[in-house]
Swiss-Prot record:
Superkingdom classification of source: Eukaryota
InterPro entries for the chain: PcG_chromatin_remod_factors, SAM, SAM/pointed_sf
Domain SAM: 31-99
Gene name for this UniProt entry: Samd13
Region Disordered, residue ranges: 1-29
PROSITE patterns cross-referenced by the UniProt entry: SAM_DOMAIN (PS50105)
This protein's name: Sterile alpha motif domain-containing protein 13
């Protein structure tokens, strides 16, 4: 399972490691909407996590999101949207692609 290193208080990149603590499947493609919402809440984006709930973004949808989707489609303020994409969505996509390419 994944856990998020909460020593990072600036909403920047967080360490994602295997753990049994939070109950999310290790592969983001298997996350339900609630897993995505909880991931962003745990990462310090309490307010912005609601947008993922409202737009019904599950793990598969999260992995398909473009920078433009995050910056405009979720109707978030620019600062948090940039951090969410650069420090969370993009790294999750990269890690998923790396783990699933053989």
């Amino acid at each position: 399972m994944l856990s998020v290193d909460m020593d990072n208080k600036g909403n920047g990149p967080v360490g994602v490691k295997n753990s049994m603590e939070n109950g999310r499947p290790p592969d983001p493609a298997d996350w339900a909407v609630t897993d995505v919402v909880n991931y962003f809440r745990t990462a310090g984006f309490e307010e912005q996590a609601c947008a993922f709930q409202e737009q019904e973004i599950d793990g598969k949808s999260l992995l398909l999101m473009t920078r433009n989707d995050v910056l405009t489609g979720l109707q978030l303020k620019l600062g948090p949207a940039l951090k969410i994409y650069e420090y969370h969505v993009k790294p999750l996509q990269t890690k998923h692609l790396k783990n699933n390419s053989s």
